[in-house]
Amino acid sequence: MICGIDEVGRGCIFGPVLSAAVIFKGNPNFLNELDDSKKLKKAKREYLSSLILENSYYAFAEVSNETIDKINIHHASLLAMQIAYEKLDINCDLVLVDGKFIPKIKAKKIQAIIKGDSIINEIKAASIIAKVQRDKLMDEYNKIYPLYALNKNKGYPTKEHKEAIKKHGISNLHRRSFKFI
């Protein structure tokens, strides 16, 4: 079995970093439609996400903004990947992670692949479901913190988001360790 892992929200200034781990059940017929989540339109991501969830074993993990501020975004991203894999509770022959760093995962073989979210189907799938999951989370947070337009910026440091912070201050879910904050 091959497990693909990716994270989303690394460059955000609001909320958690979120990771997903994916193992396909068999060989689904939609694999040729997969791509890096950043290259797909929202409707396509959501469509593929539902197919991925139906045809895979998967797990999500979030690492909070408080933890990000304590251990830094790099270590928080690796921790989210580690937790997502551990939550799967399936021993894999091969674990492939997006990027150049390897989280602390106990597996027979683990490999980091730069641009893996554009190359490896399992990582592409993890990228897609992680992005859809985090976007939904930001839509929910937008109901609590409407001043920051999280439904539009998804927690990223857009011009409007930065202006809202200047005008209203930061919330308890903003990452205080980031330069702009």
UniProtKB/Swiss-Prot annotation:
Documented EC number(s): 3.1.26.4
Catalytic activity: Endonucleolytic cleavage to 5'-phosphomonoester
Positions of the RNase H type-2 domain: 1-181
Cofactor: Mn(2+); Mg(2+)
Domain of life: Bacteria
CDD domains, alphabetized: RNase_HII_bacteria_HII_like
Gene Ontology molecular function terms on file: manganese ion binding; RNA binding; RNA-DNA hybrid ribonuclease activity
Subcellular location: Cytoplasm
Keyword line: Cytoplasm, Endonuclease, Hydrolase, Manganese, Metal-binding, Nuclease
GO biological process, one term: DNA replication, removal of RNA primer
Positions that bind a divalent metal cation: 6-7, 98
Entry note: cofactor: Manganese or magnesium. Binds 1 divalent metal ion per monomer in the absence of substrate. May bind a second metal ion after substrate binding.
Stored SUPFAM superfamilies: Ribonuclease H-like
InterPro entries listed in its UniProt record: RNase_HII (IPR022898), RNase_HII/HIII (IPR001352), RNase_HII/HIII_dom (IPR024567), RNaseH-like_sf (IPR012337), RNaseH_sf (IPR036397)
Signal peptide location: none
GO cellular component labels: cytoplasm; ribonuclease H2 complex
KW Membrane (keyword) present: no
Classification via NCBIfam families: PRK00015.1-3
Classification via PANTHER family: RIBONUCLEASE, RIBONUCLEASE H2 SUBUNIT A
Recorded family membership: Belongs to the RNase HII family.
Role: Endonuclease that specifically degrades the RNA of RNA-DNA hybrids.
Identification of the protein by name: Ribonuclease HII
Organism: Borrelia hermsii (strain HS1 / DAH)
